[in-house]
């Protein structure tokens, strides 16, 4: 089954509240587990650090050996508006390195500047706990407060 997700009129730019992210993430993914806000956080950070706008990036995503699914890619998609249909979001068959839950590269389409984000596998038990014990808003808040979770590298 293929789900199509469209943000009318560039809605992402105006979407700033946690509740709006939860609604969009749920619509795009079909649920709002803790992996979705991890992707949102990565996507927003990349747009800010690259000083680009939504649809201005190419995303290359790799899941780790123990990752349950590439759900984080859906969070990145809603934050950046990168899209498999546009060829700007690619979930690669190649796995992330040893000890990683995920490894993602986000490239500015105009400048070629690239950022890399990694989340260590040691975070997987915490993500599972958040999914079992917190509601969607609690998951969003927990991810946004977990400063050590996401390891960015690049410009």
Regions found by a protein language model. Give the residues of each.
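Sec/Tat signal peptide C-region and signal peptidase I cleavage site
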Residues: 9-13
């Amino acid at each position: 089954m293929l789900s199509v997700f469209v943000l009318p009129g560039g809605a992402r730019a105006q979407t700033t509240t946690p509740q709006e992210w939860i609604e969009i993430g749920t619509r795009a993914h079909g649920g709002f587990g803790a992996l979705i806000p991890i992707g949102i956080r990565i996507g927003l950070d990349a747009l800010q650090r690259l000083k680009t706008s939504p649809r201005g990036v190419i995303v290359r995503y790799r899941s780790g050996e123990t990752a349950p699914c590439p759900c984080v890619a859906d969070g990145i998609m809603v934050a950046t508006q990168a899209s498999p249909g546009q060829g700007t979001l690619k979930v690669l068959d190649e796995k992330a390195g040893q000890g990683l839950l995920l490894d993602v590269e986000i490239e500015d389409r105009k400048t070629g500047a690239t950022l890399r984000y990694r989340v260590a596998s040691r975070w997987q038990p915490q993500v599972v706990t958040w999914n079992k014990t917190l509601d969607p808003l609690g998951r969003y808040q927990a991810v946004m407060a977990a400063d050590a979770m996401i390891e960015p590298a690049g410009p």
